């Protein structure tokens, strides 16, 4: 494992020790927790109420950052961080501190605490710093995109990008591209199915979903197809997918080990991470150069993707456009493929839900035969299914903010500058927050229940995921086309085991059977 190699190189001085078992069972609830609001602000003058407890009094997983990291390394707990976080909340309560190597944070999971966190974020919200990613941009002389930027530089770029990437008007323009890609995936599946004498297809869709998501997102970004749904896709695009997976795999340990030491000694972990980013930028640059040349030649055409629109607007410099398009391209593969895979699995083992969704799609199409946008707005249960998948299987297991001012949560003083993480995985599976929490029930999102700050898979506010609308629309159209054309089944009804590799993914992809309708 890359993490173990790096740990040996920088942590040989750490002593062997007894370690906690961090692979806890699924959430069983806090035995002593009340969900009553326990949120307070610091006084206007910055002073704290007399009963407020100091930051150091917050329950902690251990006071030695490197000792804690060694425990994680020794037990290979990086892959089970979501389960470790779940266990920590169960043992320590709704708020706790954690030190892991270079990483210090306060972790919370109750919606009222999350609300207070976001209320305090200001106009320049700051997420967790991805130092290895930023270092790559610096070493290769690449501009940073909005994922890595902060402050006014982030805000100015984000406002411009929102118009084409996140606004409803922008979605309407790229909606046909995603619909075409989703329909083509059905054709792709039917071709494979035609080679089976049984008239069905049993398959692990893991790799195929990566191909689809890159094909669809690139079509939206560049207005051109990559050919990933063809029988023999381009080798460079497959290398791109592999590079994205490598970036995710290597990012997790790089969050906790001193990247300066890894860089100095040119460790395997560091070099693989840097090389993977190089591959990503090379492929993105090939796509970008094609569009840029056509733009410079002044070829007239209709809407042809987000990058072309940004070039026409001329509000962002070219290097900023390249940086943000590359981030969107890299960020639109695994992060969309995994929710698709988990949703297909849950629908396969919940046939009644699958039937209800199929019927909703049939009725919506009958009522909106010529308006794709209105059709998508007529699928509340399908949108509930996507929320339900992301509740149980959040792509990222936390949402983070660096505090810009002191706040008080649960009578604990948390100073400005502290990294506060919202535990999405334990929140989504908590019986205190969701009735029958482990049951896949899309209809729960249609009921008149308080769901505020309980659906945060894409983040919140001005710093929510920039690719949110692309991902939501892509997932909705994909599921709509698949459910119209195929019955989805699985033999195994057991819960799927998950691992964390900077995003949540199945330990072993499920085997699914597709039958034409």
Curated annotation (Swiss-Prot):
UniProt keyword Iron present: yes
Catalysed reactions, as listed in the record: a steroid + 2 reduced [adrenodoxin] + O2 + 2 H(+) = an 11beta-hydroxysteroid + 2 oxidized [adrenodoxin] + H2O
Primary localization: mitochondrion
GO molecular function, one term: steroid 11-beta-monooxygenase activity
Annotated SUPFAM superfamilies: Cytochrome P450
GO biological process: C21-steroid hormone biosynthetic process; cellular response to peptide hormone stimulus; cholesterol metabolic process; cortisol metabolic process; glucocorticoid biosynthetic process
Localisation: Mitochondrion membrane
Family, similarity comment: Belongs to the cytochrome P450 family.
Protein name: Cytochrome P450 11B, mitochondrial
Protein's organism: Aquarana catesbeiana (American bullfrog)
Name of the gene: CYP11B
């Amino acid at each position: 494992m890359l993490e173990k190699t790096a740990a040996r190189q920088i942590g040989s001085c750490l002593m062997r020790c007894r370690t906690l078992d961090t692979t806890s069972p699924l959430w069983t609830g806090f035995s002593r927790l009340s969900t009553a609001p326990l949120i307070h602000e610091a006084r206007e003058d910055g002073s704290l109420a007399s009963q407020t407890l100091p930051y150091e009094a917050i329950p902690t997983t251990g006071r030695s950052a490197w000792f804690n990291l060694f425990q994680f390394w020794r037990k290979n707990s990086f892959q089970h961080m979501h389960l470790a976080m779940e266990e920590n909340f169960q043992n320590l309560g709704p708020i706790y501190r954690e030190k892991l190597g270079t990483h210090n944070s306060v972790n919370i999971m109750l919606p009222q605490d999350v609300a207070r966190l976001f209320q305090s974020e200001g106009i320049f919200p700051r997420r967790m710093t991805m130092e290895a990613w930023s270092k790559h941009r610096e070493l290769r002389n690449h501009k940073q995109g909005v994922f890595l930027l902060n402050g006014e530089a982030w805000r100015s770029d984000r406002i411009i990008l929102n118009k084409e990437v996140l606004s409803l008007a922008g979605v309407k323009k790229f909606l046909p591209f995603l619909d075409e890609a989703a329909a083509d995936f059905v054709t792709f599946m039917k071709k494979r199915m035609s080679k089976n004498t049984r008239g069905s297809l049993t398959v692990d869709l893991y790799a195929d979903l990566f191909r689809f998501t890159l094909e669809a997102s690139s079509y939206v970004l560049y207005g051109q197809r990559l050919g990933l749904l063809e029988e023999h896709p381009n080798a460079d695009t497959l290398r791109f997918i592999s590079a994205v997976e490598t970036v995710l795999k290597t990012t997790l340990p790089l969050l906790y080990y001193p990247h300066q030491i890894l860089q100095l000694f040119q460790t395997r972990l560091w070099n693989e991470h840097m090389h993977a980013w190089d591959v990503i930028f090379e492929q993105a640059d090939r796509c970008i150069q094609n569009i840029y040349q056509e733009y410079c030649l002044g070829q007239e055409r209709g809407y042809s993707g987000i990058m072309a629109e940004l070039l026409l607007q001329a509000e962002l410099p070219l290097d900023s456009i390249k940086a943000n398009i590359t981030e969107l391209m890299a960020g639109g593969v695994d992060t969309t493929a995994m929710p698709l895979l988990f949703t297909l699995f849950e629908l396969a083992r919940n046939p009644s839900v699958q039937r209800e969704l199929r019927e909703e799609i049939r009725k919506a199409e009958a009522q909106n035969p010529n308006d794709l946008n209105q059709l998508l707005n007529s699928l509340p249960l399908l949108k509930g299914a996507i929320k339900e998948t992301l509740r149980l299987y959040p792509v990222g297991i936390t949402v983070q903010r660096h505090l810009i001012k002191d706040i008080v949560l649960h009578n604990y003083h948390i100073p400005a500058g502290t990294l506060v993480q919202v535990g999405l995985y334990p929140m989504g599976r908590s019986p205190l927050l969701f009735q029958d929490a482990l049951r896949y029930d899309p209809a729960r999102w249609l009921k008149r229940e308080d769901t505020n700050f309980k659906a945060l898979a894409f983040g919140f506010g001005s710093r929510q995921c920039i690719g949110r609308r692309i991902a939501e629309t892509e997932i909705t159209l994909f599921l709509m086309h698949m459910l119209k054309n195929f019955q989805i089944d699985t033999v195994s009804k057991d819960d799927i085991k998950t691992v964390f590799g900077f995003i949540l993914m199945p330990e072993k992809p499920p085997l699914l059977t597709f039958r034409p309708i």
